[in-house]
Amino acid sequence: MKPPFDQFDHQIIQILHKDARTSASEIARLLNANERTIRKRIDRLVKLGAVRLTAIVDPEAFGYVTAVDIFLEVEPEHEDEVIQTFLTTPEVSYVALGQGNRDLSIECRFKTNDDMREFLRKKLPAISGGTVRGYSLVPRIIRNIDAWMPRDDDFRAETNNEEDI
């Protein structure tokens, strides 16, 4: 299946990736395009789920300097309730369901090592239906999800004219 995105979409995404506050008029100026076309393209990219225009919060700016990846095995009959618990747990910044003996992965953020220790020793064991299989202190994140971009060949669709947008 041919990707539904073309090189023009790629250029728009690259500009927004660099600075999501870039206005449609500025993108139009940079790409020598009509502002209306840019607005329609951005709306289409959002509607298709290709981009989300949101503020990304830096945990360290708020004092959350300790990150821990935690891997859990979850009893199938408790999967939904364990996931819901983590979705409402303020320390948890990421929840992913996987396959294998470590079928739930969470990332947690803490201001101090004492906060982390309290979570690992008291709060986490109190959650029924899951067993911690391992965890890893993350002293430095080299590349975060907000830095990821699709490959160039993901933008191979024919350039759409304005009526097709």
Where are these regions (language model features)?
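A compositional/biophysical signature of low hydrophobicity enriched in polar/charged and small residues
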Residues: 1-165
